[in-house]
Amino acid sequence: MSVITIQCRLFSEEESLLYLWELMTQKNTPLINELLELIGKHPELEEWIQKGKLPTGLVKTLCNSLKTDLRFSGQPGRFYSSAITLVDYIYKSWIALQQRRERQISRKERWLSMLKSDAELEKDCNCSLDVIRAKATEVLTQIATPSDLHYNQPTENKKGKKSKKGKADKAHGKLFSLLFDAYENTTDPLERCSLAYLLKNGCQISELEEDPEKFATRRRAKEIEIERLKEQLNSRLPKGRNLTGEKSIEALETATHNVPKNEDEAKAGQATLLRKSTSVPFPVGYETNEDLTWFKNDQGRICVRFNGLSEHTFEIWCDQRQLHLFQRFLEDQQTKRDSKNQHSSSLFTLRAARICWLKRQGKGLMWNKYRLILYCSLDTRLLTEQGTQQVISEKAAKIAKILTLTKDKEELDDKQQAFVKRQQSTLDRINTPFLRPSKPLYQGQSSILIGVSLGLKKAATVAVVDAKQDRVLTYRSVKQLLGENYKLLNRQRQVSARHSHERHKAQKQKKPNQFKESELGQYLDRLLALEIIAIAKTYQAGSIVLPKLGDMREIITSEVQARAEQKIPGYKEGQKKYAKQYRVSVHRWSYGRLIECIQSLAAKTGIAIEVGQQPIRGSPQEKARDLALSAYSSRITSMN
């Protein structure tokens, strides 16, 4: 993606700020709350969850029915559109999470149904363990290929470290899938038990006697995972923002006068009381770039007016580094006006915008305690002449395809004819490009990838991989990436540890425990991102591969557990204590913020971003390498 987001403060007269504050807090946010509640109470919600989406036009229909309600009437049209888009997005995300949890539960329950002790396997097939092992050896020879068997036995290099770990993990995963499919498809008791024996022992024949306590702990751990997922599956529906605090008061009255019927109801009531309500209204989004009108006032300041709020003018207060971008927004719109609409707004640098309130330190009225912020999304390719030509080519090809498909239809209704006319007009006008400065586009080699692995001890580790040659060009640790600034990382760890200790003491004394973090972590993220982009330019990398954030909890948990088992083998309580101390000693990193910094700088440079699943096992260097190779392999597979 080549889209980045910038922000600025909007300054205006107090009357304008008051009007916008009341409109967003008393009209728009209550409307969004009502829409969320209506969908949550709909009798067909479970059916929509199974389908994976809400019916097309449902949110819009509900919103239209509420427009006549005095509580929500009198808003600009764009405010209603923003509410519809936001509610649809919230439920789309929530339904996706619910479906993911259901899939996880299904997979774990399948595994749990197969996971049996050696004694249970002997009883199911009425055979001894030696017979099961012999059958397992036979099945393994039939199903596994020679390469699978080879990689199933880890080899060691001269230094005693396991080699070809990435290939071994891949081969092991393939063999595991084959064995599990065979288990699902066979009905022979002995064969099923032998397959179950192989699967629970990591696709190998174990010569050791099974420890009943360890097996019981392993099975119970999986049961707990399923129970936790089911609790999350039954979690509360999406709720709005409680700006007035009325719901908190209602929950307090309920808890005062009613005794909980069971433990679950008590937990739910406690969670409601402890939940910190926000006093910030929902943002308002402007999805089209012509909803904003740019101009300069008498003092020469750049100002903006919004569609539906044309009587109110807002000055742009921004950083000097971003001023030229807002100047570009103004120039684009001025160019189109001067040319009498011979230019197309589809080539405006600005793509979309959003206004919201941001809390700040201050006293007085609510609209003075909060700053009005404007977020603008822009396409970095439209900042240069070469990038604009690239966008024109893409849009022209897309419109030509649409027109070809539409013209193949024999009869078109009035809406379709108007749509064809608009597309043809856009196609004619995009050939009149805006004046842009010339700057060569970044040209990287598609076979060279930058893999970035994230971890608890090592925040970021980089591997530059030539996937076509299947070799690593270089590695970079977090210490090498930061260079002389590595000492700042130690300072960040000390600050984080101190805040953690102070927060723990405040919680025990039931005092406020929200300690404001410094911007040192954000500064370190920017330094890491800058160095990663510099490495990509040096090696002419075609893309940067980042791990999925959804996998970070499992990755970090696995990393801590592996370290604990290595330090204190065979002692569970000691491992738990060590893991807790280890988490305190290392930093708590904002991986999402780091990824955003890398994505933003990559978009400005023109380097593609790919997302993959980071391996759980291996060193940080091996994880970064395997992440890049996996992304390249997936890319080749999708192309074929």
Segments the model singles out, each with a brief description of its role:
Residues M1-I450, L454-N640:
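Nucleic-acid substrate recognition interfaces
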